Amino acid sequence: MAERANLVFHNKEIDGTAMKRLISRLIDHFGMGYTSHILDQIKTLGFHQATTTSISLGIEDLLTIPSKGWLVQDAEQQSFLLEKHYYYGAVHAVEKLRQSVEIWYATSEYLKQEMNSNFRITDPSNPVYLMSFSGARGNASQVHQLVGMRGLMADPQGQMIDLPIQSNLREGLSLTEYIISCYGARKGVVDTAVRTADAGYLTRRLVEVVQHIIVRRRDCGTIQGISVSPQNGMTEKLFVQTLIGRVLADDIYIGSRCIASRNQDIGIGLVNRFITAFRAQPFRAQPIYIRTPFTCRSTSWICQLCYGRSPTHGDLVELGEAVGIIAGQSIGEPGTQLTLRTFHTGGVFTGGTADLIRSPSNGKIQFNEDLVHPTRTRHGQPAFLCYIDLHVTIQSQDILHSVNIPLKSLILVQNDQYVESEQVIAEIRAGTSTLHFKEKVQKHIYSESDGEMHWSTDVYHAPEYQYGNLRRLPKTSHLWILSVSMCRSSIASFSLHKDQDQMNTYSFSVDGRYIFDFSMANDQVSHRLLDTFGKKDREILDYLTPDRIVSNGHWNCFYPSILQDNSDLLAKKRRNRFAVPLQYHQEQEKERISCLGISMEIPFMGVLRRNTIFAYFDDPRYRKDKRGSGIVKFRYRTLEEEYRTREEEYRTREEDSEDEYESPENKYRTREGEGEYEILEDEYRTLEDEYETLEDEYGILEDEYRTLEKDSEEEYGSLENKYRTREGEGEYEILEEDSEEEYGSSEDGSEKEYGTLEEDSEEDSEEDSEDEYGSPEEDSILKKEGFIEHRGTKEFSLKYQKEVDRFFFILQELHILPRSSSLKVLDNSIIGVDTQLTKNTRSRLGGLVRVKRKKSHTELKIFSGDIHFPEEADKILGGSLIPPEREKKDSKESKKRKNWVYVQRKKILKSKEKYFVSVRPAVSYEMDEGRNLATLFPQDLLQEEDNLQLRLVNFISHENSKLTQRIYHTNSQFVRTCLVVNWEQEVKEGARASLVEVRTNDLIRDFLRIELVKSTISYTRRRYDRTSVGLIPNNRLDRNNTNSFYSKAKIQSLSQHQEVIGTLLNRNKEYPSLMILLASNCSRIGLFKNSKYPNAVKESNPRIPIRDVFGLLGVIVPSISNFSSSYYLLTHNQILLKKYLFLDNLKQTFQVLQGLKYSLIDENQRISNFGSNIMLEPFHLNWHFLHHDSWEETLAIIHLGQFICENLCLFKSHIKKSGQIFIVNMDSFVLRAAKPYLATIGATVHGHYGKILYKGDRLVTFIYEKSRSSDITQGLPKVEQIFEARSIDSLSPNLERRIEDWNERIPRILGVPWGFLIGAELTIAQSRISLVNKIQKVYRSQGVQIHNRHIEIIIRQVTSKVRVSEDGMSNVFLPGELIGLLRAERAGRALDESIYYRAILLGITRASLNTQSFISEASFQETARVLAKAALRGRIDWLKGLKENVVLGGIIPVGTGFQKFVHRSPQDKNLYFEIKKKNLFASEMRDILFLHTELVSSDSDVTNNFYETSETPFTPIYTI
């Protein structure tokens, strides 16, 4: 008893794996016989206990989990939110699917964990619990189906059904759940049947290929080995598994002491010594070389030492053991077992979820924002990605918690946010588990309703291939399907409806024919549109066309449609300046200058006030074509005028596109620094004096200028800015202007307030036309108020009435460089053209360099011209212009000059008395007064003299002595001739001008239409209707009615019977389709109900930004220009508020909002940050901008064609539906219902822009990666593919490519005979290693342990053949014949001639049909063919394998039969030494091999993952 007391008593459960471990320890300790006795006793004990316990199992024992209810409810709420996000276009379909799968999968997994603890706590002796968790029958996932929830099912294709089964089998399933469950169960049944057969067949083929491998000798005498070293990133467990039971191929030394010798087998003790040695000196330890079946030199058998220990008992394997069959069965059997397992949990989806980090307590979270990068999670939520391990602190009231977040995790909260306890703050990337198979899947998204497709400007309009209609998305953006119902009109030319007119519902029936009835009544023709299928009231629309005579010629209807071919052209008409090819008669054409140079300019919203320029002409004579920048000087007619002498500093934009840097001066450059955008405002020079901090006051500018850059690529990237109309009737330029009209009523005092400003900025607001595309030149900065204002009305003040006699252009160059830049030239040095100034700027002029260092930047000026040092400095008048004939007295030269020169007086450095004079060449231009209206402008305009007075004014585009910077590609226009509206103030306040586009016979004609407005222009002005253009006959157009076609009707409210027509041009020319937008698809939203003057914003509001009249449609509705929209005050750059402000969560988050920073992202992904002075008022849902303690309410922007997402808080009322704004009234706007779909980068869009889609049409195709459900049924085919060597996707293509390379290169390096051998050996060795790794991976993922050596034996048979190539015709083998590598090597040695061959990867089926025994081949497949071939060749079967002997009924050569088969020869003992002598080359060859394979295995391609998509490359288990 005393002994018994000393024994250690272990009181713990033992499961299957612990049992295995115990048994193997017992065998090691006691040997086989004794162990079996012990196990026998355990068995008896077990049965005895089971009998006495008498466990019964009834349905009541299935206890459901109490927390299931609320877990499911929580998951449902999450997926409901997800649906909403999807509906609003915030996440796309793949993200939605992915997230819903993960939500339900996580719920199901959580339930599974709960189930375990629930049983353990409430009913530990529950029979279900005892049975499944002891491992007797059933496992956790099967019990989970019974008492947890059945979860997500997979359909027969292995795709996920995203409707989860929420009930379990104990509660019973609903009808829908039952059907889905049947889907899954059917997959399970099919899997079980098919996969079991597959697994069985795999086993049969495996056994077939290796049945003849028997242990026949003790030692084959190989000197090769495979190196194993923990430094390769192997885990210790794997290291131990790889080493135990192997035999060493080389002595192992630690220091100078040998701790293990060659041919010693490795037991657990030796492994432990290795591990301690490695831990002590990790880098000095040498790799351990072991023998494996790969290194065995025999062809058709294997030796004891290369095989190692027998898996059953721990000694070296016996001679005569049939190790091949053991190997085949060991690999095949788990497959059979694992497929049977699917029968119970058939079709249940399993996937991976990420680990979450939760907040330990309530508090404010803080982390370093510089170490994270904003990103979008795979569920479409915003998050931050950590570059490195991040330290996060959570400050609660009294305690500071700190949490570490590992590398590559996603942080799901913002900095300084308030988090609650157990709130998820981060998600650890699931990339650490590489076991899930990933595959690329296409997912098609289908349209949910009929509609018209629109997309934002981010999608390329040109299709990917020339004739296809597929488009790749360059960046993430929305696609919109605008709801529509179709109607085909039968007679094309008789449709009177202009695009976007409203009409009654009854006017169209599907095939209605329209009849015209022309009745003449007192000069006014009213066209009645009759509908044969109409209701009682037949007349639907009356069009009045005053002062028109109707000719009964052929009628055309016209509409602005989005043409496929012309879409670029239309997309270019973005803003309010149009170039108009006004048509005129042929005979008048000769008298006038061609109208190409004349550009019409329609001011914003088409209002012409007094002195407004509405057309101008750039005279080519006043254009400087060369590159370079300089100064313009005037000479007025009145010579009393003093010239300005002072050099002024102007802040201009750096002209060099290579220099990209941020500095406050460069605030105004666009990001790319393309040549097209210039901001050359004279006024900016006051910035520095008035405000030290540019950032705060004018920080907004940067955003606004940058917005233009988005369009620059597509629109102005090409320099062909002339677009021909179809017939080539002359070209017209498309010019743009981005100005906003300021309606200051006269009592505003706004005119007086900045009268001075208008004079100053007048000349540069009209920069030359060529190079101002899209640039916001009209901005000017008020010196008093300090805010940016757009003035569209350009008025001439008296300053410009002065006659300028001539003006001069003097070359000069200015570079503004950052303070830090190192200059390559000195101050006051003289340089030549194209001298390098800094690292990447060169000068364009030669001359004198002056450098000024300012606080924030360096200014470098280059003055062209000569330098003179006069004797008497006082006689020279600085800054004077000297005409050519006058010569300078004090210069040495006395010859006449051809050109004007400009003399400037300069000081040298700081000394007062030394002066020098720079004489600079000037180009002179004289003004020409000879132009008159008739030569410049068409007659049609001049005939309207009585209501419209115009006068012609020349003015100079640059201020006196202002430096003009010029980009290389553009010309400088100095003088512009303008047509100015010139009526007396008291007669009319203004006119409305708009352009009308008329398409007759496929020619586009544009007319300028001017309406005279009687009322004063102020904020409260009434709104005239949008135009509805009548019919125009195609024979000719009367000149005098250019301004007469517009309809006086007001738009009625959308009643029940109102619809809006949109016309659409088909490819089919005869029948245009009309889209009818039903009233049910539109919703009207009241805008400004309660305020009397909704937009009287005070002048001090610092942000009235640039306006952009361009819908997302890519086309301008022709009448946009006369929307007198006083409600177009934008808050900021057409920003949509894209945060989801649902009412329910607003109230909770209100406390937090104060601290947050908001950035709003609009449709074109421009991001603007508002800083911290915004407060969201959750109850009124209006945005307030808090500036300088004055509250100023600015309303959200509305503009035509804008898309609005549902639930956006624009006004006091919520927007109930997503849609596109397409009618804007004074107090409301009308939305056309639309559905947004989010599409990511790389998705393919089907169909053209504006295409009509029907319900169920394919819209987008996503390609995404998804993790396969990772049961063995998915894994087995992979194993089989590798064994059959036909794996297209899983075996990395790199490996095949590398085999090719090795086969070609190594013979070239080493010469022929050895080269082929080594090339083939290397290839084979390397591919063997990667194949073993891949197969092991599949089984390990299932928790199945198979010893490497089984797989190695089979892989060895698959890779041991080479194919004789045709290069060297040898006498021995036929080209293309498959022979063993060693046989080829021996034949080459015996023949003394080179045999050319290359390594080949055979599949197991082909390897079985390429053995040395034809009997075994014939009994496997293709019996007749094999036997016939063998008979023809006269093959001999030596009956070496098992199968041949079984077939013929002989004794099989294993076990006891082995001794009869092999006669041991006395030479065996000497074999090793002989081989040593023979292989003179062996040691060298081994070195080459090791050197080369080390190179190879360090390359991660070979050993790349089995599943190419997983994140971390899988390091090799061992290298050669």
Curated annotation (Swiss-Prot):
EC number: 2.7.7.6
Subcellular location: Plastid, Chloroplast
Molecular function (Gene Ontology), one example: zinc ion binding
Cofactor needs: Zn(2+)
Pfam families the record matches: RNA_pol_Rpb1_4, RNA_pol_Rpb1_5
Keyword Lipid biosynthesis included in the entry's annotation: no
UniProt-annotated stretches for the region Disordered: 645-676, 705-786
Catalytic activity annotation: RNA(n) + a ribonucleoside 5'-triphosphate = RNA(n+1) + diphosphate
Chief place of localization: plastid
InterPro entries linked: DNA-dir_RpoC2_beta_pp, RNA_pol_beta''_euk, RNA_pol_Rpb1_3_sf, RNA_pol_Rpb1_4, RNA_pol_Rpb1_5, Rpb1_funnel_sf
Cellular component aspect of the GO annotation: chloroplast; DNA-directed RNA polymerase complex; mitochondrion
Top-level taxon of the source organism: Eukaryota
Top-rank EC class of the record's enzyme: transferase
Keywords (A to Z) from UniProt: Chloroplast, DNA-directed RNA polymerase, Metal-binding, Nucleotidyltransferase, Plastid, Transcription, Transferase, Zinc
Subunit composition and interactions: In plastids the minimal PEP RNA polymerase catalytic core is composed of four subunits: alpha, beta, beta', and beta''. When a (nuclear-encoded) sigma factor is associated with the core the holoenzyme is formed, which can initiate transcription.
Chain's role: DNA-dependent RNA polymerase catalyzes the transcription of DNA into RNA using the four ribonucleoside triphosphates as substrates.
Family: Belongs to the RNA polymerase beta' chain family. RpoC2 subfamily.
PANTHER family the record matches: DNA-DIRECTED RNA POLYMERASE SUBUNIT BETA (PTHR34995:SF1)
HAMAP family the record matches: RNApol_bact_RpoC2
Protein name per Swiss-Prot or TrEMBL: DNA-directed RNA polymerase subunit beta''
